[in-house]
Amino acid sequence: YLDSGLGAPVPYPDPLEPKREVCELNPNCDELADHIGFQEAYQRFYGPV
């Protein structure tokens, strides 16, 4: 399936994207994610991914 504008394949939707966005909106979670990775940071703030 091709994107109508760019002619490039549409990337597979990331099931973790909504959680990644939640973490990015929390400055503390976002900063921690830069050091230890998104999934580990998310778990520390919000519980299991």
Swiss-Prot record:
Q: Where in the cell is it found?
A: Secreted
Task: Print the keywords alphabetically.
Answer: Biomineralization, Calcium, Disulfide bond, Gamma-carboxyglutamic acid, Hormone, Metal-binding, Secreted
| Keyword Metal-binding in annotation | yes
What are the Gla domain coordinates in residue numbering?
1-47
Q: How is it modified after translation?
A: Gamma-carboxyglutamate residues are formed by vitamin K dependent carboxylation by GGCX. These residues are essential for the binding of calcium. Decarboxylation promotes the hormone activity.
Q: Give the disulfide map.
A: 23-29
Kindly give the PROSITE patterns that the UniProt entry links to this protein.
Answer: GLA_1, GLA_2
Please give the biological process terms from Gene Ontology that the record holds: biomineral tissue development; bone development; brain development; cellular response to insulin stimulus; cognition; glucose homeostasis; learning or memory; negative regulation of bone development
Q: Which domain of life is it from?
A: Eukaryota
Name any GO cellular component annotation.
cytoplasm
What protein family does this chain belong to?
Answer: Belongs to the osteocalcin/matrix Gla protein family.
| Protein name, as recorded | Osteocalcin
Q: What is the lineage of its organism?
A: Eukaryota, Metazoa, Chordata, Craniata, Vertebrata
